[in-house]
């Protein structure tokens, strides 16, 4: 095609002719059989392409280079006879006379740091019983999400996890762990089963940069939002990153263990950008997979140097192929999309349709961040809050309106929210309870489209935020009774609201990062889950546990019925109190005929009127499990504790 500038390439890639002549709908990547392996690579602008063969994934010489044959739509391929399992390879792609050695964008396994791709017989990576592993059935009433990094989950020595498995996939498979082995306070998988969450959302588990898999991990740390290979797991989370099949098998073992515990697995996916511009996609088809400005320079809507061009046909195919692969090969139960606002609406809806077409695919969750990390060249409908009405109703969004209303803005550490007494914020609490279905701000198709939360891996932990609002110089490791009460109130609001409840791991035991708001590459010690705090704040853990169970006992709060929030009746109360009632849906198995809920963000007790009838106290400011016993029944009026969410059930 001749030497082209980035601006000329942009014009070419966005032309109808290029799309017509190069769009390919067939399989790409390695196709293994015992008799041989077919490799396919989409590289329509290449003049030449070859495969380089290696015996090892690192520190070994090339044992041969073979030319690939060009076919229609720019797909290059080669047949490698014989059993190729365990062999490593790269491609050399020549464009405009420049040869680049690169990994396979569709590789299913890789060597150290993912620099070489690996041919793998996936059947040999299946853990025992994998063929019987199925996605757990989690009804909407039981859906809740607990977000954690694989590394954070178990790297604390107090976790009780065997040393070789700390910070690894296999930590999720170890049962019976307790704090310092005390046999009393459960940690890790046993802790999760007791807590009662429906899903674990794993921060990026695909192969990422910024952690050198060839070096000890004692001081290395990264969240993983630096993708290098999208279709196989991160090696630093495996016990042997040099052997490509190990990371695949151990990732599957983790998923199987969570499934056996009745917990679904949601994968945090970061297709919106890649770690470096020199990557497996750009080395294969220069500038195709990433948006450019008009002058050909890179658009940077991710804030990370580049952004994925989801609207281009083969980029869209790549993203959807990858999602389908993880759903089918790894039995993933849901996907969380980082910076979802960088994808176009059509791609997100196409991904939803593709997942729906899988057996059981309609139960696979999809939700994401409906914003971008900077100005973007995506000049069509972005998958953001403004275009929520254009997204499939089973594509959800993180609701920063709910987050900020409850605890205050995330970009100003000292800005209060409702639980800290911000004047006028009670109006937004009503919107949050209804999952904004009764608001003009961002009416969703259904309440289940709203992810209700107050903390995630980004920004301050809830505990740190509460202390920053209360004190100019907080002591983050000190206990604080008022902050604990405000923490319980925050949980009491979003766990009694419509929508999909979501929490950062450790929020339920006052997790602190000592005021660090962006710990993506801070020390492992700062990021780890401090399991001693789960013991220290066991009463707070039990408060979350009780609310999660209470929510499951009143299914209407988790409903997918778009009209359900219309049944909410709000009371006219003295500001800033908020109160409401909600009848149970007919035949949904609710334990109570209706709920009556009050929020009190003040430092004094308040008396409120109750609707007619008898109301059993289910939860108050200190205990969320009163409903499990013979709790008191109230009529006409009730007393609200300071900084409290109080829940009654009609009897």
Please place each PLM-identified region on the residue numbering.
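Loop/helix patches that line or flank the sugar-binding groove of alpha-linked glycan CAZymes
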Residues: 444-616
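The feature marks proteins involved in alpha-glucan
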Residues: 1-34, 70-174
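Structural beta-strand segments of beta-rich domains
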Residues: 35-39
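Conserved, mostly hydrophobic/aromatic
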Residues: 41, 91, 148, 202, ...
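Active-site-proximal helices and loops of the catalytic beta/alpha 8
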Residues: 64-70, 218-225, 339-444, 507-546, ...
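Substrate-binding/active-site clefts of carbohydrate-active enzymes
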Residues: 151-330, 336-359, 365, 376-377
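Glycine-rich phosphate/pyrophosphate-binding loop
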Residues: 109-158, 397-479
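C-terminal beta-strand-rich structural cap/linker in extracellular carbohydrate-active enzymes
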Residues: 43, 85-89, 630-651
């Amino acid at each position: 095609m001749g030497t082209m500038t980035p601006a000329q390439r942009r014009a070419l890639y966005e032309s109808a002719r290029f799309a017509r002549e190069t769009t390919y709908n067939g399989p790409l990547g390695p196709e293994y059989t015992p008799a041989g392996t077919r490799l396919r690579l989409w590289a329509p602008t290449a003049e030449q392409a070859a495969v380089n063969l290696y015996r090892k994934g690192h520190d070994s010489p090339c044992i041969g280079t073979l030319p690939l044959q060009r076919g229609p739509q720019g797909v290059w391929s080669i047949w490698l006879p014989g059993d190729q399992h365990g062999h490593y390879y790269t491609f050399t792609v020549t464009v405009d006379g420049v040869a680049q050695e690169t990994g396979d964008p569709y590789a299913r396994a890789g060597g150290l740091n993912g620099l070489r791709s690996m041919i793998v017989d996936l059947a040999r990576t299946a853990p025992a019983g994998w063929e019987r592993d199925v996605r757990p059935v989690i009804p909407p009433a039981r859906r809740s999400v607990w977000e954690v990094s694989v590394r954070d989950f178990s790297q604390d020595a107090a976790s009780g996890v065997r040393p070789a498995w700390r910070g690894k996939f296999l930590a999720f498979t170890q049962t019976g762990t307790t704090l310092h082995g005390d046999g009393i306070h459960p940690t890790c998988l046993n802790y999760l089963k007791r807590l009662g969450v429906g899903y674990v959302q794993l921060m990026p588990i695909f192969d990422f940069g910024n952690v050198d898999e060839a070096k000890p991990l004692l001081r290395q740390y990264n969240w993983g939002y630096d993708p290098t290979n999208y279709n196989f797991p991160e090696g630093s989370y495996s016990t042997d990153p040099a052997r490509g099949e190990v990371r695949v098998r151990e990732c599957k073992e983790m998923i199987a263990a969570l499934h056996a515990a009745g917990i679904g697995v949601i994968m945090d996916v970061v297709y919106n950008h890649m770690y470096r511009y020199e990557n497996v996609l750009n080395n294969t088809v220069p500038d195709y997979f990433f948006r450019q400005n008009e002058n050909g320079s890179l658009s940077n809507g991710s804030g990370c140097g580049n952004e994925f061009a989801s609207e281009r046909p083969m980029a869209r195919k790549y993203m959807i192929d990858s999602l389908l692969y993880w759903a089918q090969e790894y039995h993933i139960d849901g996907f969380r999309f980082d910076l979802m606002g960088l994808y176009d609406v059509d791609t997100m809806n196409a991904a939803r349709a593709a997942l729906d077409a899988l057996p059981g695919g309609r139960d696979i969750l999809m939700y994401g961040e409906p914003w971008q990390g900077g100005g973007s060249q995506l000049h069509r409908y972005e998958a953001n809050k403004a275009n929520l009405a254009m997204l499939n109703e089973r594509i959800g969004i993180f609701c920063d309106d709910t987050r900020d209303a409850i605890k205050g803005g995330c970009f100003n550490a000292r800005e209060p929210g409702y639980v800290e007494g911000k004047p006028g914020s009670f109006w937004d609490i009503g919107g949050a309870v209804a999952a904004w279905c009764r608001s003009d701000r961002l009416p969703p198709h259904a309440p289940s489209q709203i992810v209700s939360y107050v903390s995630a891996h980004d920004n301050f932990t809830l505990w740190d935020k509460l202390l920053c609002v209360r004190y100019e110089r907080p002591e983050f490791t000190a206990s604080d009774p008022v902050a604990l009460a405000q923490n319980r109130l925050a949980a009491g609001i979003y766990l009694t609201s419509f929508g999909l409840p979501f929490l950062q791991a450790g929020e339920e035991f006052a997790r602190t990062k000592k005021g660090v708001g962006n710990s993506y590459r801070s020390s492992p010690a700062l990021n780890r889950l401090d399991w001693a705090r789960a013991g220290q704040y066991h009463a707070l853990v039990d408060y979350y546990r009780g609310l999660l169970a209470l929510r499951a006992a009143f299914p209407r709060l988790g409903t997918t019925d778009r009209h359900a929030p219309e049944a909410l009746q709000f009371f006219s109360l003295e500001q800033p109190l908020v109160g409401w009632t909600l009848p149970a849906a007919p035949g949904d198995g609710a334990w109570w005929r209706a709920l009556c809920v009050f929020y009190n963000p003040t430092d004094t007790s308040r008396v409120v009127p109750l609707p007619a009838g008898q109301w059993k106290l289910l939860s108050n400011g200190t205990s969320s499990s009163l409903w499990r016993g013979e709790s008191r029944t109230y009529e006409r009026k009730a007393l609200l504790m300071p900084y409290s969410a109080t829940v009654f059930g009609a009897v």
